[in-house]
């Protein structure tokens, strides 16, 4: 009957509206969530703590394992092995994750474009930055920024 059909349609419309609300809540939570990769900064290991401090101080420069090892007065192979052992990440993974976190912070300034953010965070090219960013967040920096609601 028409009444039954109308009831079924009304019920369906309500379900769709509820789902829309759920999606909106998830999106809002996602937007409000702290978009950063959790990176401990203290490891109770002098060499690794010093290496992390080196990253924090120099992430915006063109630096890597070699520069960190030279700065700390240890061999690259020793630092590489120890870093992986203590942090669970290799040096470059940690450095890139730190740079990505800094880039996400920089995105909140709508005056900065993605290329500027990439170079200011120590990435050699915007393309490399986008590739690494996508590996962490599953989307490009531009797509990510659009979700955050900042103008490109």
Question: PLM ranges: what are they?
Answer:
Residues 68-76, 80:
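Helix-turn-helix
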Residues 52-57, 62-66, 74, 85-124, ...:
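Terminal helix-turn-helix DNA-binding modules in bacterial transcription factors
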Residues 38, 127, 131-152:
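…primarily DNA-binding HTH/wHTH and HhH modules…
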Residues 6, 42-49, 97-98:
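Amphipathic alpha-helical repeat elements characteristic of tetratricopeptide repeat
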